[in-house]
A protein has these predicted regions:
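Core catalytic DNA strand-manipulation module of type IA topoisomerases
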Residues: 1-449
Length: 449
């Protein structure tokens, strides 16, 4: 940082801080890494086959098991082999019960991720509001890694306090009337604080707009935890058409259960599938080839960034939001509404990201339109209205590229050095090593080579 004092600054540039932080820079590194992947992305064309069949007045769309291929001629040859077969044979027809699991009890990291995704607030704003709600006695301590409730907690008493609310009171009452189920146990217990949950009821008229959003999310998450999993029936059909395999999937939601109080998860019935029998043969109503191209990944969003930081040990549940705010304050990163330059499309063919258009028509003729690129997420999840994505500034990119070339063996912009230092410190304490030795090992990692 000695160079900073040698560079003349004028006007608004005077007094700006350019600093290195062992958590701050990996945070910036995640943003820059995704940005470079987007900027350097080169789309590739691909081709795939889709088959359709109408039975009992229901149009069934079969997706190619291969997904897609990047060799057009290979797809054409395979497609012609399918056409020569003329008929398809059903080799699998299965209906089985399925569930969408209710959410785990709420941790700080999950509160920040979901707050950024659903509440139109930054993670720092979410934590500030949560702390205010805790201070006022409405929710439990909002800084916790615990995602399991102790068996001794009287959760029913907490549910009962929510029965008076106009929005979710009826659902809370249904839990009191026999619908209550013990929450799922996660893997984490910090032995200090329980999962985040409402401790008292407060009317929305007593809260400001942001407090309403956070309090409602905490309450609905808690009630969802105390409810039953959503129940459905999944139908899977697989056919053999000219030696190639195609499949169709259908879902019927039977009981929404926790979804009735937790609108942040989406799980809806898909296309209705008619009854087939194994061994049945039929002539496809339509068989088409489609082309598309891979598309660049999206820029990093705040929920994704928090997840990366959590997985790589960058910051704690109490400091992640601060690190994200700091790289914006230093003007290394700017935030903008997600999809500002167009959101990438999804491919119902399940073969990768990209956009596609159909070729051919019934039995291989021309006409028709295809699907969009990319496998759509199958695990539900709510909308993304209000989510922000991060774009590094020229300064942010320059800092990462500069620090990557200073001569240290382990990159300063990656999470590995910070993780190694943390592991070394923990190991030193746990094994009773000499503190000076642990310090020497840490300093050695930072030496220029």
């Amino acid at each position: 940082m000695a160079l900073q004092n040698m560079i003349p600054t004028q006007g608004d540039e005077r007094g700006k801080v350019i600093s290195y932080g062992s958590c701050q820079f990996p945070t910036l590194g995640f943003v820059v890494d995704r940005y470079l992947r987007v900027r350097n992305f080169v789309p590739e064309p691909f081709w795939y086959i889709k088959v359709a069949h109408t039975k009992d007045k229901i149009d069934v769309k079969f997706n190619w098991r291969r997904g897609h291929l990047f060799d057009r001629m290979a797809v054409i040859i395979i497609f012609e082999r399918c056409l020569l077969a003329k008929t398809a044979k059903v080799i699998k027809m299965a209906k089985k019960p399925t569930k969408k699991w209710k959410p785990l009890p709420l941790t700080t990291v999950e509160l920040q991720k979901n707050g950024s995704r659903f509440l139109r607030m930054t993670s720092q704003e979410v934590m500030k509001v949560a702390e205010d709600l805790y201070t006022k006695g409405w929710i439990s301590y909002p800084r916790t890694e615990t995602d399991q409730f102790d068996r001794g907690m009287d959760l029913r008493a907490l549910v009962a306090r929510q029965t008076q609310d106009n929005a979710w009171g009826q659902f809370a009452q249904s839990l009191m009337d026999g619908g209550f189920k013990q929450p799922r146990d996660g893997r984490n217990n910090d032995k200090a604080h329980p999962p985040i949950h409402p401790v008292n009821y407060v009317a929305s008229t007593q809260l400001n707009q942001n407090e309403k959003r956070v309090y409602e999310f905490v309450v609905r998450r808690f009630l969802a935890c105390c409810s039953e999993d959503a129940v459905g029936e999944a139908t899977d059909i697989e056919i053999d058409y000219g030696g190639e395999f195609f499949h169709a999937h259908g879902l019927t939601v039977i009981a929404r259960n926790y979804l009735n109080v937790y609108p942040y998860d989406k799980w809806v019935s898909s296309q209705e599938l008619p009854q087939y029998t194994v061994g049945e043969t039929f002539e496809p109503t339509e068989a088409n080839t489609h082309d598309g191209q891979t598309s660049a990944p999206a820029y990093l969003t705040e929920p994704e960034l928090i997840a990366l930081m959590d997985a790589n040990g960058i910051g704690t549940d109490a400091t992640m939001a601060e690190h994200i705010a700091k790289v914006q304050e230093r003007e290394y990163v700017i935030a903008r509404p997600k999809g500002g330059s167009g959101a990438p499309a999804n491919n119902d063919n399940g073969g990768g990201r990209g956009r596609g258009r159909g070729r051919g028509g019934a039995r291989g003729g021309r006409g028709g339109r295809g699907g969009r690129g990319g496998a759509a997420a199958q695990n539900g999840g709510g909308g993304t209205v209000g989510i922000q994505e991060f774009i590094p500034t020229t300064l942010g990119v320059a800092l990462i590229e500069g620090y990557d070339n200073v001569g240290i063996e382990t990159s300063l912009s990656k999470p590995f050095l910070r993780k190694e230092v943390g592991a070394c410190s923990c190991c030193g304490v746990g094994a009773g090593r000499c503190q000076n030795q642990a310090l020497a090992n840490t300093l050695d990692r930072w030496k220029f080579r």
